[in-house]
Amino acid sequence: KECMVDGTVCYIHNHNDCCGSCLCLNGPIARPWKMMVGNCKCGPKA
């Protein structure tokens, strides 16, 4: 799993799950929102 340089999207290679958390502008630890297959966007800080 990896976080992109802008810190807004997480991606994992198995297509089933969102990654746990990543660094985002809206908080150091953000909850990933389920988006498209294999992609997550960071949501509000949990």
UniProtKB/Swiss-Prot annotation:
Superkingdom of origin: Eukaryota
GO cellular component entries: extracellular region
Subcellular localization(s) per the UniProt record: Secreted
Annotated region described as Keys region for toxin activity, given as residue ranges: 31-33
Gene3D superfamilies registered for this protein in UniProt: 4.10.40.60
Pfam families, per database record: Toxin_28
InterPro entries from the UniProt entry: Insecticidal_knottin-like_sf, Toxin_28
Coiled-coil annotated residue ranges, if any: none
Disulfide bonds, paired cysteine numbers: 3-19, 10-22, 18-42, 24-40
Expression sites by tissue: Expressed by the venom gland.
Any one GO molecular-function label of the UniProt entry: toxin activity
Record key words, sorted: Disulfide bond, Knottin, Secreted, Toxin
Family: Belongs to the neurotoxin 16 (SFI) family.
Entry note about domains: The presence of a 'disulfide through disulfide knot' structurally defines this protein as a knottin.
Function description: Insecticidal toxin. It inhibits insect voltage-gated sodium channels (Nav) by partially blocking the channel pore in DUM neurons from the American cockroach, not by acting as a gating modifier. The inhibition is only partially reversible after prolonged washout. In vivo, the toxin causes flaccid paralysis followed by death when injected into Heliothis virescens larvae. It also causes uncoordinated movements followed by full paralysis to sheep blowflies (Lucilia cuprina).
Protein name: Mu-segestritoxin-Sf1d
